[in-house]
From Swiss-Prot:
Protein name: Small ribosomal subunit protein eS4
Family the UniProt entry places it in: Belongs to the eukaryotic ribosomal protein eS4 family.
Organism ancestry: Archaea, Methanobacteriati, Methanobacteriota, Methanomada group, Methanococci
Domain called S4 RNA-binding: residue spans: 43-106
UniProt xrefs under Pfam families: KOW, Ribosomal_S4e, RS4NT, S4
GO cellular component: cytosolic small ribosomal subunit
Amino acid sequence: MAIKGPRKHLKRLAAPANWQLPRKERTFTVRPSPGPHSMDKSLPLLLIVRDTLKCADNAREAKKIIQMGKILIDGVKRKEYKHPVGLMDVLSIPELNENYLVLFDENGRISLKKTEKTGVKLCKIVNKTVIKGGHIQLNLHDGRNQIVKVANALKAEEDIYKTGDSVLVSLPEQAVVGHVEFNEGKLAYITGGKHVGEFAKVVEVEKRTLYSDIVTLENKDGEKFKTIKPYVFIVGQDEPVISM
């Protein structure tokens, strides 16, 4: 029989391995709704509230907390318990005065780091296009599209944003307030591969045409390693521009 419409259920056995769910406790788990992050790079908000933060004992309590608007993602109340929460998202609980930054641990699993409220978020530019009117649209890693108004998109002095660069976005206004270029010597956060979750300096970038560029990096111990450019998230010069 043909599939008629989107899948609405997810068995624990079929859930991404990096969710680290007890596979045999129950049959089903929460399937994240389509949103800013892919399923294998995010966690549904309900699982974060119940399993990661331990703010609820069961799914019913977690749903009630979420539906009451007590959880903010990037400064916006999210009342959908299936909302996917992923890399660099800022999760806030105003009643507890707590803020968390979503990162990956050394095994590629979603982890939350307690942080201070900064009012900004770091986003990676994954693509950019020229839209009607000659302005530049930046496509960010979390599904956002930011429009940068320029007089002439063909002029290098105006087209300063490149794919792979990072931008600071204000929360909840969602305006670009900062820019970190992808250059040699910049500090990067690794989001995939066997070095996931590490910080390292960009040493060299090997350009390739048919495949992803190869980036050589050096970690704090002086060890050099290589990974592909999509796994490299620029976060600053010598220190991250946000608390990480």
